[in-house]
Amino acid sequence: MPELPEVEYTARQLRGAIVGATISEALVFWERTIDHPDVPNFLAEIADRRILDVRRRGKFLIIDLDGEVLLTIHRRMTGNLLLLPPGWEIDTNLKTTDPVAWNIKGPSFRPWNTEDTTNAAATDLFYCRVCFNLVDGRRLLFIDTRKFGRIGLWPSKREQEALEGLGLEPFSDEFTVEALAKALAGRKGAIKQVLLDQGVIAGLGNIYADEALYYAAIHPLRHANSLTPDEIQRLYEGIISVLTLGIEHGGTSFSEYRDLWGEAGDNYNHVRVYHQQGKPCDRCGTPIERIVLGQRSTHFCPTCQKLT
């Protein structure tokens, strides 16, 4: 699942690429992707909207549009945004020739001139659930193989409702050591699981929680309310450090994540424990271990991150 760095990196790319552009229309190929409002109203309200800004809150992308409305995009497990240059055509023949395949793959996209592609996308693209056509001929695709991603269109005044339940925002003025200590106080659960709770810290996921705990030398099974002030200070610094590194390296691509141009992020070359089981810890040389916690893989150094 794309986490804060992947979403932030995409937001920055989008900000440079589409702010000022106008959405002529949206095409919806999997209706459940639209979670607000219903699809007919979504299609009617999105047409002819100019893009004013692109932001992020937690794992949500927010696209501000004229007319005081905004798009929210949550990519969930496998959602990606891909910006295509003018000249890419849609083939919907599969809908009538093979409805079963259509239900899985959706339409195909291909450039009219297959020898002149300007991004890293494959010649034929599938799994598009929503397509935003821009007036200048470009297409912004929401590609989601597993169909868990969700898109909403909201009045700007209802932004808080659209993003309800999100916790502290890293990099904001509100995210301080004191705020983190307060958020962890009274929580008896394993610190790894607490960090994954979007109501505590918005944007952290499996990759960066593992990396932050390693940075802070805290075992992932420690009770959250057992952390000392020094450990909370290190954890705060670790969260900021690993998220910053992830953004600088374009996000982490172990499987599905790609950026706006279809490129994989490079941060997988810089992780220290995530998916590194069996490899030596870069601090002490002990092999990194993997356990399952809350049905998620968790990676740590048993020497540097002691449970007791």
Could you tell me what each predicted segment is?
Residues M1-T308:
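Structured catalytic/nucleic-acid-binding cores of DNA maintenance enzymes
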